[in-house]
């Protein structure tokens, strides 16, 4: 019996040593299709940059955040803690105080980030070459100013804080310039040429892409508790809620070129 067990174990060990353990593949990088182009230089409307630098907590804020039992990521709450000051003077023995800092959106956890590269149709250029004998050329020219808006998919408390945290996570995952509102200016053009064969009509469609971000936001009541020389943050009545958002990609356009024998 022992000999048989040893034989089976040896086979298993040889199998793993021969084939090796299969590595766990890392998450695929967010890929932008070739049909999507940046128009940041060509856009006639100057969109404001939405870059969100990571807010570094002060020494006091870091101490409070590190000892909180609930993770806190809200940049507005961190900023408030940065601007706070607690005197280092020893407090009276037995001194206790509990200060209510408010009910906050504490953090956001991203579950899914996907793109709709044709979120909103913003323009169509048309070139009719049905009567032509040679190949015609056309290019993208934005005919009217178009404002693209995103937003949360449901009403939630502290919506602006939630949007800020969601956009921060989505920008980190996609490495794309995101904004809840972006504008493509009239007269925006690109030099790329599209060729229209004789007896054909060329249609160049332009779309504004957007990212669909889904996840969970955590809420809680935040208290600053002082006890003697000790200070800490206490979070009570913690709740969580699923939330989604559409966030347009700033200064980017998706192009779709089609040829047709008949008008559309």
Curated annotation (Swiss-Prot):
Read off the InterPro entries from this record. YfkD (IPR025548)
**What upregulates or represses it?**
Transcriptionally regulated by the forespore-specific sigma factor, SigG, and the general stress response regulator, SigB.
Signal peptide span: 1-26
Provide the alphabetized UniProt keywords.
Signal
Pfam families per UniProt: YfkD (PF14167)
* Protein's UniProt name: Uncharacterized protein YfkD
């Amino acid at each position: 019996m022992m000999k048989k067990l040893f034989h089976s174990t040896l086979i298993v060990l040889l199998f793993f040593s021969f084939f090796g353990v299969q590595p766990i593949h890392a998450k695929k990088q967010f890929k932008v299709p070739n049909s999507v182009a940046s128009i940041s230089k060509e856009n006639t409307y100057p969109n404001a940059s939405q870059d969100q630098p990571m807010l570094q907590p002060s020494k006091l804020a870091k101490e409070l955040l590190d000892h909180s039992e609930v993770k806190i990521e809200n940049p507005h709450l961190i900023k408030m803690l940065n601007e706070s000051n607690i005197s280092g003077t020893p407090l009276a023995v037995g001194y206790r105080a509990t200060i209510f800092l408010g009910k906050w959106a504490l953090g956001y956890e991203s579950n899914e980030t996907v793109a709709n590269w044709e979120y909103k149709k913003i323009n169509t250029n048309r070139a009719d070459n049905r009567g032509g004998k040679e190949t015609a050329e056309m290019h993208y020219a934005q005919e009217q100013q178009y404002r693209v808006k995103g937003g949360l998919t449901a009403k939630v408390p502290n919506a602006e804080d939630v949007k800020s945290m969601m956009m921060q996570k989505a920008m980190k995952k996609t490495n794309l310039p995101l904004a809840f509102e972006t504008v493509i200016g009239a007269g925006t053009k690109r030099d790329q040429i599209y060729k229209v064969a004789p007896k054909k009509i060329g249609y160049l469609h332009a779309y504004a892409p957007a990212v669909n971000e889904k996840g969970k936001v955590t809420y809680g009541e935040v208290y600053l508790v002082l006890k003697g020389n000790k200070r800490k943050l206490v979070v009570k009545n913690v709740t969580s809620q699923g939330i989604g958002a559409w966030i347009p990609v700033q200064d980017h356009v998706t192009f779709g070129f089609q040829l047709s024998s008949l008008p559309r």
